[in-house]
């Protein structure tokens, strides 16, 4: 069920080649990497280098999401609902 939604999102994004640098596409790619690393770490709990990589990718995605929420709140809400991500906490 989740894979189908990602396939539809990526097919929409890949139709427009010029949008590969867009924030939405970057967040989508980071989310896929995060989900792959999370499933890998469920099997290999002591893979500390992968844990570090996961934390770095999480930070990058968080920075992009915070930038998007400041610049365009509507696009941010749509992206979060499409990718099934929790909304970040505001300080």
Swiss-Prot record:
It comes from the Eukaryota. InterPro entries: Ribosomal_uS15 (IPR000589), Ribosomal_uS15_bac-type (IPR005290), uS15_NS1_RNA-bd_sf (IPR009068). The keyword Ribonucleoprotein applies. It is found in: Plastid, Chloroplast. GO terms for biological process: translation. GO terms for molecular function: structural constituent of ribosome. Keywords: Chloroplast, Plastid, Ribonucleoprotein, Ribosomal protein. One of its GO terms (cellular component) is chloroplast. Pfam families: Ribosomal_S15. HAMAP family: Ribosomal_uS15_B. Part of the 30S ribosomal subunit. Belongs to the universal ribosomal protein uS15 family. This is Small ribosomal subunit protein uS15c. It comes from Eucalyptus globulus subsp. globulus (Tasmanian blue gum).
């Amino acid at each position: 069920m989740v894979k189908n939604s990602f396939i539809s999102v990526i097919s929409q994004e890949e139709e427009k080649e010029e949008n590969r640098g867009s924030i939405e596409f970057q967040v989508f790619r980071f989310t896929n990497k995060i989900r792959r690393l999370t499933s890998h770490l469920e099997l290999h709990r002591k893979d500390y280098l992968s844990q570090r990589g996961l934390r770095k990718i999480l930070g990058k995605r968080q920075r992009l999401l915070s930038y998007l929420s400041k610049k365009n709140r509507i696009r941010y809400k749509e992206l979060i609902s499409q990718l099934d991500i929790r909304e970040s906490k505001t300080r």
